[in-house]
Amino acid sequence: MMSGAATREELSLTVDTAQWGWLRPHLERGGIIVVSPDLDLVEAGFGISSDDTAMVSEWIDTGRVAKPSATQIFDWDAEPDTPFRILIASPYVLVQPLSPLVS
């Protein structure tokens, strides 16, 4: 088993989907990080897990990674079936809302 940060390939194999209702407990412990749709989820996970502070700081400064806003939390609590792509980069759970289907 490798020590240190996971590789991009290893992280890509752990991307999954989950509904907000499953993710809510992670929010309560402060573990949810929202990744904007224009940032690759695996790249964000790699930057965080490898402690690339310069890159992660840039993402934070540009709003590409952030803690969920009160509005997002309110909306997701109202729709607990809201689907997300997720990636665990311990101690965080990185989430990207999946685009709703237009009907």
Feature roles, as predicted:
Residues 1-50:
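N-terminal, charge-rich interaction modules
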Residues 23-25, 62, 79:
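Enriched - but not universal
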Residues 3, 12, 36, 49-50, ...:
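Generic serine detector
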Residues 43-76:
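Short, hydrophobic/π-rich interface segment
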Residues 7, 14-17, 53, 62, ...:
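Residue-identity detector for threonine
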Residues 37-39, 60-64, 91-93:
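Generic secondary-structure microfeatures
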Residues 67-103:
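Short, compact, well-ordered microdomains
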